[in-house]
Amino acid sequence: MALTEQKRVRLEKLSDENGIISALAFDQRGALKRLMAQHQTEEPTVAQMEELKVLVADELTKYASSMLLDPEYGLPATKALDEKAGLLLAYEKTGYDTTSTKRLPDCLDVWSAKRIKEEGADAVKFLLYYDVDSSDELNQEKQAYIERIGSECVAEDIPFFLEILAYDEKIADAGSVEYAKVKPHKVIGAMKVFSDPRFNIDVLKVEVPVNIKYVEGFAEGEVVYTREEAAAFFKAQDEATNFPYIYLSAGVSAKLFQDTLVFAHESGANFNGVLCGRATWAGSVEAYIKDGEAAAREWLRTTGFENIDELNKVLQTTATSWKERV
């Protein structure tokens, strides 16, 4: 993959001195509202969502190589980033139409790659739901959509991070044993599709290829994959792309995510970092709602710091530089 000079400079801004992307993800919108709603009766306000993102940016970006935010509630937080931290901005609308299984992609109406760049971002991030076994008609529509964004990012000379969330149109519960059995095929298949240079993607943000909660040794209940089978899926995922790729934390606990990264590394996955969200900051939501800004800062300086510090230590021994893939 040939990077332009500008894209390379921006990717270096997003990663640490070893070429590892240790990014903090806080572009959650719908998911954040749901988290907040667990701790208060009234609807979460824009001001609350903006302030919490500012607090997390202010307290934790000194320990992250970069931060992913959304232009809807995250712009005030972009001003609170540590000077050394890079910035990614999300380009997609939150959620999807639940009345259909299509999960069509949709850009934020008043944003473009140009506007994201003008806001000071070092990369454009777009989230795509993709079922590799959907109709060719639907998947061609999704592929064309990603081609447009890739072309925009080429025009603006800004890195394009595609986040792929695999799913099955026929299985509603992504946490089920039924879905766990097909997840490796779904995740790896989608990754292969979007490793085609025609999409002009620079970094893939992907799920791990198994539901770790069903892996032998991690599972508390039913086992879907032996350790050997799971390891083979991590290796197959690594071989599915020539692009730099990073893992998303998918809402699991900090400890489980760290253990997953160790397992991935031991399985031969040469991943290039993470975009870690709720696994790092989720506990600050309750502290903020119940006891306000000072309590949230205290949580972020203690438990939040521990989460990100432990994650960074794990990354230094498990992740590899994206420069080895470009």
UniProtKB/Swiss-Prot annotation:
Keywords: Lactose metabolism, Lyase
Record-linked SMART domains: DeoC
Keyword Flavoprotein: no
Signal peptide residues on this chain, from the entry's feature table: none
A GO biological-process term: D-tagatose 6-phosphate catabolic process
Stored InterPro entries: Aldolase_TIM, DeoC/FbaB/LacD_aldolase, LacD_aldolase, Tag_1.6-dipho_adolase
Pathway info: Carbohydrate metabolism; D-tagatose 6-phosphate degradation; D-glyceraldehyde 3-phosphate and glycerone phosphate from D-tagatose 6-phosphate: step 2/2
EC main group: lyase
Entry's EC annotation: 4.1.2.40
Pfam family, one: DeoC
GO molecular function, one term: tagatose-6-phosphate kinase activity
Reactions performed catalytically: D-tagatofuranose 1,6-bisphosphate = D-glyceraldehyde 3-phosphate + dihydroxyacetone phosphate
Family, per entry: Belongs to the aldolase LacD family.
Name of the protein described by the UniProt record: Tagatose 1,6-diphosphate aldolase
Gene: lacD
